[in-house]
Amino acid sequence: MKLDQAARGLFLTELVSGFFLAMRYFFKPKATLNYPFEKGPLSPRFRGEHALRRYPNGEERCIACKLCEAICPAQAITIEAGPRRNDGTRRTTRYDIDMVKCIYCGFCQEACPVDAIVEGPNFEFAAETREELYYDKEKLLANGDRWEREIARSIAMDAPYR
């Protein structure tokens, strides 16, 4: 028994086997991504930064029904509706989302009858102050304009499952 232990210690078999194990994993393809330069695929149902969408003619989609405000469990959405227009429709005068309160549940997107409020593909929207995470209507519309192509593609891919 002692001779066997001495032989293992002399030949450093454990060290050598550990070295070969490390070398085997060293030359295998990496399992991780180099994040800032490589990004993994996002699901069509990914819920990121909020955006307000427009119709192709440039008119905003939101009809001020306030369903998203009512269904929000975090009470992060505040909407004020303007007076009815001549054609009987309403538009919002104020649409604010407090992203600090938001839990990204997606209920607002599910409740919207005209797909006006959506959670887009952007997940890189860090801020230095809390005030930057208070989104007003202009910021939400700008997000919608910036991400419209990706948002439309995600909604089209998810449409059969709705």
UniProtKB/Swiss-Prot annotation:
Keyword flag Transmembrane helix: no
Pfam families assigned to the protein according to its UniProt record, in alphabetical order: Fer4_7 (PF12838)
Gene3D superfamilies in the cross-refs: 3.30.70.3270
Topology within the bilayer: Peripheral membrane protein
Positions contributing to [4Fe-4S] cluster 1 binding: C62, C65, C68, C112
Cofactor binding, per record: Binds 2 [4Fe-4S] clusters per subunit.
Gene Ontology biological process: aerobic respiration
Intrachain S-S bonds: none
Cross-referenced InterPro entries: 4Fe4S_Fe-S-bd, 4Fe4S_Fe_S_CS, NADH_quinone_OxRdtase_chainI
GO molecular function: 4 iron, 4 sulfur cluster binding; iron ion binding; NADH:ubiquinone reductase (non-electrogenic) activity; quinone binding
Subcellular location: Cell inner membrane
Domain 4Fe-4S ferredoxin-type: 52-82, 93-122
Catalytic activity, reaction form: a quinone + NADH + 5 H(+)(in) = a quinol + NAD(+) + 4 H(+)(out)
Keywords, in A-Z order: 4Fe-4S, Cell inner membrane, Cell membrane, Iron, Iron-sulfur, Membrane, Metal-binding, NAD, Quinone, Repeat, Translocase, Ubiquinone
GO cellular component: plasma membrane
EC number: 7.1.1.-
Entry keyword Cell division: no
Role: NDH-1 shuttles electrons from NADH, via FMN and iron-sulfur (Fe-S) centers, to quinones in the respiratory chain. The immediate electron acceptor for the enzyme in this species is believed to be ubiquinone. Couples the redox reaction to proton translocation (for every two electrons transferred, four hydrogen ions are translocated across the cytoplasmic membrane), and thus conserves the redox energy in a proton gradient.
Oligomeric and partner information: NDH-1 is composed of 14 different subunits. Subunits NuoA, H, J, K, L, M, N constitute the membrane sector of the complex.
Family the UniProt entry places it in: Belongs to the complex I 23 kDa subunit family.
NCBIfam families, per the entry: NuoI (TIGR01971), PRK05888.1-4 (NF004538), PRK05888.1-5 (NF004539)
Protein name as it appears in the record: NADH-quinone oxidoreductase subunit I
Gene source species: Xanthobacter autotrophicus (strain ATCC BAA-1158 / Py2)
Gene symbol of the encoding locus: nuoI
